[in-house]
Amino acid sequence: MIKKITLITVSTLFFFGCSSKNNVTHSENLTALNWHYKIHKDIEDSNLDQADEDFLSLQAEHPSSIYIKTDLLTLYLAHQQNKEYDLALFYLSEYEKRYSSVEEIPWIEYQKIKMNFLKYDTPFTNQKMLLDIITMCDNYLKKYPNSSYAPEVSTILAKAELTNKYLNAKISRLYKKLDKPKASKLYETKIPSNSKPPVIPWYKKLFYW
């Protein structure tokens, strides 16, 4: 089972582009503690590619090491701070599957919502992703209404719903320009008068309707 998990981890990290990483060296035959120290040194040096590589080696050489648990969370936080949200989510999901306690689940699910919301950095696109975030928030608030993270999830939900309203309004206007009144009507929405539209960098506006 451990070998299978390691292989899955290797293949998943490869998917994220390990083959094209620069400034990565391969070491071997270190103690688990030395790998642990090396991973933390990599992160201190802002070399997350090397940290990923060294974590794979730690797992391969010491699959039962006590350091894997803490290093998964450390790498999650490091990639989150570096705005590499897909990799952050990968490490968090690995931690959840292998080590999380029941008490940690509300925090982990909140972190997943936050990461997905931070990934959504191009307003007026990818409505499915936006709707998925809204669904995740709704499910969280139903499942963990008394969680200490519920207020933050409610804030994300409000922002996502408002962004979706602006997106629907934009789609409605587009259909109206295309002389498709029925389709336009489907997307009509009322936007709060005191709200502000999502901010889009000028260079991204070139690709919007």
Predicted features, each with a name:
Residues 1-18:
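Sec-dependent bacterial lipoprotein signal peptides
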Residues 18-209:
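Acidic, polar-rich low-complexity tracts and alpha-helical solenoid repeat scaffolds
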